[in-house]
Amino acid sequence: MRLLKSHPLLKLVNSYLIDASQPSNISYLWNFGSLLACCLIIQIVTGVTLAMHYSPNVLEAFNSIEHIMRDVNNGWLVRYLHSNTASAFFFLVYLHIGRGMYYGSYRAPRTLVWAIGTVILILMMATAFLGYVLPYGQMSLWGATVITNLISAIPWIGQDIVESKIITLIINLSFIAILFSIVVVYYYILLHVNFSSNLPTIGVIHQNALKKSNKALRLDKQEYISIPSSFLAFLAGLVDGDGYIQVTKTSKGFIAIKLVISLHLEDLSILEYIHSVLKIGKINIYKDLRSPTCKLVINKTDLQEILFPLLMYNKIFFLTNTRADQFNLAMYIFKNDIKMYNQIPDNTPAVFEIPKNPIDYTLLPFFKNWIVGFTCSEGSFFIKSNNDGCFQLKQRIHTNLFEAFKLMFNTNRKIDTTNNFNQFGVSSKSDIQKVINFFSFSGLHPLVGLKYIQYIKWLNNLRESLRYSTLNYPDAK
């Protein structure tokens, strides 16, 4: 293993500067942050060097500057580098802020990163101001007086601060410069945790894989970020029901990873809808099988670059144990850049923790939209032979998850666990009304494909039924 990844200190540096998660198709607009870091390093090094020879005394300042320019080795270069880098610092920081405002860097989950960046800007201006007001600096006496007196606007204590020696003490100790550096370090820590305002690629993608993928059809990374979280929650529910993440071994012992959503051919419109939003994956149709099917297959590169980063960005995850385990395994392989199948460990850490009890499922912000996706794969709306309306969800044993359905639909109906399957079903008038209210909620992702048609027909049959005719139905569209 390389020293960068084994040494305790170098491992930290490597994770921040070399292996930090960043998009593979990042633009030049994301260079301003690294350029500003270079400017900060230059300012600190040249500033400390100048401070060794500069005297802030009015009587000695001019002579100390001449000493730097004439006697210090390359002193003229250090002085001009310090002053010109200061100008470049502000020029780049305004471009950096403009890029952040244009791409929405102030939005969650990077709100705190943006707030710390604002603090850095204020400290940066304060530090620059202290440099300008030094004897033989670039600011006039009256200009410095006006800016200093801004502090007097602070209620109750402002005037005392201006008249006291506190500001002089701060200048002499270079306190603001020290605080500025500390805040910058904290800013980079937050940026490492919350990523930049673009989708980070998970792990390392080989250049050959990037060449093979058809990027011409893809959206811009910023457009992917704008995809509603309701759609991603719907997709997670659909995958939990009728999808799987397949990790297989190639003939040469390498790892192959893909995500597959398999539906009946009549539900082809669902896959076409997903493909139209994500612009990734390939739809395959199998008409020769006993039960004609269609499959959306998303390859490893698209999982690393698009889908998994989107789920991580929106804090959406799979809620069935099987799918969660598959996701954790794939994420571990991506993050650790594992190439060979025999290098996969027996146990992998969980990226997200599945709720331990039913109530915790209902507290997840994406759970309602997840139910819609799960309904499109494992749900059904039908009329029984006795003309009772029924809504049903069915899958293999996931006890806590199905108990959460009871809480979400506010019903006391018992979960049927026959033949190692969980079955949640309601048919009473009050329960059917709750189901109608749930799927009629305006903020919910709609049902899609054949399940939507089934739901509309189900509503029409309920309206015509004597038993359910008095229920409140959504307006017909």
Swiss-Prot record:
InterPro entries: Cyt_b/b6_N, Cytb/b6-like_sf, Cytochrome_b_N_euk/bac, Di-haem_cyt_TM, Homing_endonucl, LAGLIDADG_dom. One of its GO terms (cellular component) is mitochondrial inner membrane. GO terms for biological process: mitochondrial electron transport, ubiquinol to cytochrome c; mRNA processing; proton transmembrane transport; RNA splicing. Pfam families: Cytochrome_B (PF00033), LAGLIDADG_1 (PF00961). Residues 1-163 are annotated as: Cytochrome b. It is a multi-pass membrane protein. Disulfide bonds: none annotated. CDD domains: Cytochrome_b_N. Encoded from partially processed cob mRNA that terminates with the in-frame coding sequence of the third intron. This is Cytochrome b mRNA maturase bI3. The lineage of its organism: Eukaryota, Fungi, Dikarya, Ascomycota, Pezizomycotina. The gene is bI3.
